[in-house]
Curated annotation (Swiss-Prot):
Disulfide bonds join 53-65, 54-63, 59-66. The modification Leucine amide is found at residue 67. InterPro entries: Conotoxin (IPR004214). This is Conotoxin PnMLKM-011. Keywords: Amidation, Disulfide bond, Neurotoxin, Secreted, Signal, Toxin. It comes from Conus pennaceus (Feathered cone). GO terms for cellular component: extracellular region. Residues 18-51 form a propeptide.
Length: 68
């Protein structure tokens, strides 16, 4: 029973954790916190597949163009 617990609680998470050696998780999370709230909102909505309403002069593929 102890071996099974060790495999599932220690080895399995280590095997599925894939870190890029040049960019640790702490640095990535810190960089995301430095974004302003509007940028974070845009990233989150883009990741969720939702589109943000933007002014017509700044239309991109990440947002919908609003009239007025």
């Amino acid at each position: 029973m102890g071996v099974v617990l060790f495999i599932f609680l220690v080895l399995f998470p280590l095997a599925t954790l894939q870190l890029d050696p040049d960019q640790p998780v702490e640095r990535y999370a810190e960089n995301k916190q430095l974004l302003n709230p509007d940028e974070r909102r845009g990233i989150i909505l883009h990741a969720l597949g939702q589109r943000v309403c933007c002014p017509p002069e700044s239309c991109t593929d990440r947002c919908l163009c609003c009239l007025g």
